[in-house]
A protein has these predicted regions:
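Histidine-/acidic-rich catalytic cores in large beta-rich domains
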Residues: 124-528
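Bacterial Sec-dependent N-terminal signal peptides
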Residues: 1-24
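Short glycine/proline-enriched turn or capping motifs at secondary-structure junctions
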Residues: 6, 114-115, 507-508
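Generic marker of residues within folded, mature protein domains
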Residues: 12, 20, 35-37, 51, ...
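Short, solvent-exposed coil/turn linker segments
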Residues: 2, 38, 52, 294, ...
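Acidic, low-complexity Ser/Thr/Gly/Pro-rich repeat segments typical of extracellular/periplasmic
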Residues: 22-132
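Proline/serine/threonine-rich low-complexity linkers at boundaries of modular beta-sandwich domains
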Residues: 18-27, 522-527
Length: 528
């Protein structure tokens, strides 16, 4: 049979394309030469093109620990068909160096050959996680006894009169009502008063209760509606002998738990502050990672416990398919935390958001900064605020320079591409809190303040807080820690900043976030 010239052309082109234009992995985890890596980490390789799953084999992975020796494992291809996951059969050992060599020969579905990979990393010296209960007790200013947190099934499907509520339900006092939006209010109180319980609650604009669910022991954080119509909240759990960990509880519209999300790879303390359910069925969340660090070069304790943060993306099967650790990217000296204490809360992250291009925005309270993380490579695209700020500010209050916002919470991306955040304002003189909206020019690195709301008189929330823009242009502000001392817990403002709705709870009550979502017989769509 005579072969055509066209056949030979495509054959030669295919060979040249494979040899001269080899493919590469866009993302690899753990990062090469990284330190303090979890003993239970998986290995992640991501290509920009779909992988030929039939060519994947555990034999392509040569994983060796200097103490634990050779590690066999299993290989999976994630649901994006681009991300290869290797799960060692046994954990690594503390304080060992791990060498990973991936053979050349893995192919994309169109036959392109991916290169070999060689990375090294060092594991954590810890054989067991550090107990975080004392750190969290201080963070949330808890005076009550720590118990296992457990949501009870008491909820109601209609508006309730005050005298039909439990005796420990917090009183809601509406102080202003001026044509607020129609959505229902979603929040959970954090009580510092023994006579008042912790509740997930859905409220009408007049303060009456649509649904509630009591949380026994600690509290629920960030009660909200997910894009799929389910609801979620963050849950702190304290297990004997005092080790703390967190999780996110997903519920149906009857407030019945249907799923649980936690960080993987051995990062046990899922920080229950931010959980995103993405359109592709994946989820984003992050963990606190306490590690022993010699802080004497910074004037601190040579045996300090320092907390880093670990962002994870989980696929629909809850495999970790993306992992980003502050240890790998952020210098210790970027933090405004006291570096001389025995326990250093270095980062104190509190919120995740996804930008219009799919990349991650990460709010770090103790750095007074927001960073944008490239979700395909893990690289930092930019830093807004803090010691490494890359932006020039326009229309801002120059008396707040250089940290125009500080110790912030609750980063969100608006449909027009602008971002909102709750500026706690800890570094303002004097301190005051506000909601802000910035228009970012990522190319020219400018941040233009296009909206802000300061309460009159000023309110200072030393911790927590939220800002949410509604579809009708109104904005919701949750005042976080400030409401525990008699300030408003919730304020809704019109586009002209006149107050549409405001209410308080008794002293000793605060809310991590206060939000609004549509609610009728069920839940309509919601933004993350």
């Amino acid at each position: 049979m005579k072969l055509s010239a066209t056949f030979y052309f495509f054959l030669i082109f295919s060979i040249i394309n494979t040899v001269i234009f080899p493919q590469k992995f866009d993302y690899i985890s753990p990062k090469d030469n990284s330190q303090l890596v979890s003993l239970s980490t998986n290995i992640i390789l991501r290509s920009s093109e779909d992988i030929d799953e039939s060519r994947l084999s555990p034999k392509d992975f040569n994983v060796i620990g200097t103490l634990s020796g050779f590690h066999s494992g299993i290989v999976k291809l994630s649901d994006d068909n681009k991300t290869i996951l290797f799960f060692p059969d046994t954990p690594f050992l503390p304080n060992e160096n791990i060498s990973i060599n991936v053979n050349k020969g893995i192919k994309t579905i169109d036959g392109k050959v991916l290169p070999s990979v060689a990375i090294h990393f060092n594991t954590t010296p810890l054989s067991h996680p550090i107990d975080l209960s004392s750190l969290l007790q201080s963070e949330y200013q808890l005076g009550n006894t720590i118990e296992n947190s457990e949501a009870t099934n008491n909820f109601l499907n209609k508006s309730l009169a005050a005298d039909s509520l439990p005796s420990d339900f917090p009183q809601i006092t509406v102080t202003t009502s001026n044509n607020p939006s129609d959505e229902k209010i979603f929040l959970s109180n954090i009580t510092q008063t023994p006579s008042i319980g912790n509740y997930l609650m859905i409220l009408n604009n007049d303060g009456s209760v649509v649904k509630y669910k009591k949380v026994i022991g600690l509290f629920g954080l960030g009660f909200k509606v997910l894009p799929n119509g389910q609801l979620s909240y963050g849950d702190d759990i304290f297990a004997s002998p005092g080790f703390a960990y967190g999780r996110f509880i997903v519920m149906d519209t009857t407030l019945t738990p249907v799923d649980v999300f936690q960080t993987g790879n051995g990062y046990n303390y899922t920080f229950p502050a931010s959980f995103l359910l993405l359109p592709n069925g994946h989820s984003l969340l992050f963990a606190i990672d306490p590690q022993p660090v010699d802080m004497s070069p910074y004037g601190g304790n040579p045996d300090a416990t320092v907390t880093g943060e670990v962002i994870q993306e989980l696929d629909a099967s809850k495999n970790v398919v993306f992992q980003w650790r502050t240890w790998d990217y952020l210098p210790i000296t970027d933090s405004y935390a006291d570096l001389t204490t025995n326990t250093v809360d270095l980062i104190h992250a509190n919120a995740l958001a996804v930008d219009a291009d799919g990349d991650i925005l990460f709010s770090m309270r103790h750095l007074s900064s927001i960073i944008k993380i490239n979700r395909q490579t893990g690289n930092i695209d930019w830093i807004l605020g803090g010691k490494q700020n890359q932006f020039s500010y326009i229309n801002e209050n120059e008396s707040n320079a250089p940290n125009y916002f500080s110790f912030q919470h609750d980063i969100r991306v608006l449909p027009n591409g602008n971002i909102t955040l709750f500026d706690n304002g800890t570094q303002h003189t004097p301190p005051y809190s506000r909601g802000v909206e910035y228009k970012l020019n990522e190319q020219n690195k400018t941040a233009t303040l296009v909206w802000e709301y300061r309460h009159s008189p000023d309110i200072f929330a030393s911790a927590n807080g939220s800002v949410q823009r509604l579809e009708n242009g109104n904005t919701i502000l949750g005042w976080g820690q400030a409401s525990a001392t008699g300030n408003p817990m919730f304020t809704e403002v019109h586009p002209d900043n006149t107050v549409a709705l405001e209410f308080t709870m008794p002293a000793g009550q605060k809310s991590f976030r206060a939000l609004k979502f549509p609610w009728a017989s069920g839940i309509s769509s919601a933004t993350v």
